[in-house]
Amino acid sequence: MSLEGVFKEGFVTTSYDSVVNWAKTGSLWPMTFGLACCAVEMMHAGAARYDIDRFGMLFRPSPRQSDLMIVAGTLCNKMGPALRKVYDQMAEPRWVISMGSCANGGGYYHYSYSVVRGCDRIVPVDVYVPGCPPTAEALLYGIIQLQQKIRRTNTIARA
């Protein structure tokens, strides 16, 4: 958060967008949408070694309680409508991280008849995390990239 001025009286001046976006970055609540082996790495990021909680993130089981969806794994054609339905149930503002080669573009199963070639065909994706499977560090880097994107977002224009 960039502060435009700090005065001797203890006042701080900044913009409304800076404060709101700073608060949003520290309270992302992801909803897990684990579809394959990438979900294991996502769970690994929530464990003690990487501790995703230090970013203010709590995994939520319900789409109505979350504002971030992490799509991890191979998305099949039958699962596409369910993904869209869950995404539509999330409250605004909402963000999506596509985790792994299969979620990004079909991955190893790209030419299979039953695989969606990227979850961005179903829901808008904000951050892509590459890898097969991506490491927990890669997911944390993707979360940091999303936080930087949120800080740059114009709050009033998005609403």
Curated annotation (Swiss-Prot):
Keywords: 4Fe-4S, Cell inner membrane, Cell membrane, Iron, Iron-sulfur, Membrane, Metal-binding, NAD, Quinone, Translocase, Transport, Ubiquinone. It catalyses: a quinone + NADH + 5 H(+)(in) = a quinol + NAD(+) + 4 H(+)(out). It is found in: Cell inner membrane. It comes from Polaromonas naphthalenivorans (strain CJ2). GO terms for biological process: aerobic respiration; electron transport coupled proton transport. NDH-1 shuttles electrons from NADH, via FMN and iron-sulfur (Fe-S) centers, to quinones in the respiratory chain. Couples the redox reaction to proton translocation (for every two electrons transferred, four hydrogen ions are translocated across the cytoplasmic membrane), and thus conserves the redox energy in a proton gradient. InterPro entries: NADH_UbQ_OxRdtase-like_20kDa, NADH_UQ_OxRdtase_20Kd_su. The keyword 4Fe-4S applies. NDH-1 is composed of 14 different subunits. Subunits NuoB, C, D, E, F, and G constitute the peripheral sector of the complex. GO terms for cellular component: plasma membrane; respiratory chain complex I. Its EC number is 7.1.1.-. Its main location: membrane. This is NADH-quinone oxidoreductase subunit B. The keyword Ribonucleoprotein does not apply. [4Fe-4S] cluster binds at residues 37-38, 102, 132. It comes from the Bacteria. Binds 1 [4Fe-4S] cluster. Belongs to the complex I 20 kDa subunit family. GO terms for molecular function: 4 iron, 4 sulfur cluster binding; iron ion binding; NADH dehydrogenase (ubiquinone) activity; NADH:ubiquinone reductase (non-electrogenic) activity; quinone binding. It is a peripheral membrane protein.
